[in-house]
Every structure is written in structure tokens, then in C-alpha cells.
């Protein structure tokens, strides 16, 4: 008999300081927060999550927010940066590679 241990990774999640959509969901004060994500991960047996930053609506500094939050949970969370999202003024402007390089230097990025 073999016992297999698997690490379960959610490869695409989002988290925000402020709920970005209108109308807000009833629990918009907690929905989308890192702590809520971790609770959902624990509840569903997920070991690690990739946080795909999205500088959407009320969260223009989402890269910074996520970077600060993952410092508290480095074993559980991984950050992917947002350098060219459709909600930003930089969308489809030249310099995405330079913005990614700058983000990689500033944050502990994995992607």
C-alpha cells in the first residue's frame, strides 16, 4: 500500500483590499480579502494559491497590497504582478516588459 501526498495549488485567484464590483456582494467587507481566501483554501484542502493581481476599479495599487499580504503567508501564497491590465491607464501601451522587470525587482514575484 502506498500513501500519496499531493500538494494542491490553486493557480488563479484574486484578492483585493476593496471589493471592486458594483453592486457589492453582501459580505463585501471580507469578500476578496486574503484572510477570506485562506479560510476558503483551508476549508477545501488547498495548500497554496497564486494571487493574480488585478488593478481593477478601487484597487489601483493591487500589486502593493498583495505583496504586503504574502509576506505574512509566504508558504501559502505566490504573487503574479499586473503590468498591463485593461483597467489601468497603461493598458496596451509600450513598456510592459520594463514594467514587469521593475515589478520583479520590487516584489517577490513568481510570474
Regions found by a protein language model. Give the residues of each.
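An N-terminally biased module of ancient metal coordination in phosphate/nucleic-acid-related enzymes
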Residues: 1-64
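Active-site gating/metal-coordination segments in enzymes
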Residues: 48, 57-111
Amino acid at each position: 500500500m502506498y500513501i500519496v501526498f499531493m500538494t494542491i495549488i490553486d493557480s488563479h485567484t484574486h484578492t483585493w483590499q476593496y471589493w471592486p464590483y458594483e453592486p457589492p456582494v453582501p459580505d463585501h467587507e471580507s469578500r476578496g480579502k486574503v484572510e477570506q481566501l485562506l479560510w476558503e483554501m483551508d476549508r477545501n484542502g488547498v495548500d497554496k494559491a497564486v494571487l493574480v493581481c488585478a488593478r481593477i476599479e478601487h484597487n489601483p495599487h493591487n500589486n502593493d497590497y498583495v505583496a504586503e499580504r504574502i509576506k505574512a503567508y509566504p508558504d501559502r501564497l505566490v504573487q503574479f504582478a499586473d503590468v498591463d491590465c485593461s483597467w489601468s491607464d497603461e493598458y496596451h501601451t509600450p513598456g510592459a516588459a520594463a514594467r514587469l522587470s521593475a515589478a520583479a525587482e520590487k516584489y517577490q514575484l513568481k510570474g
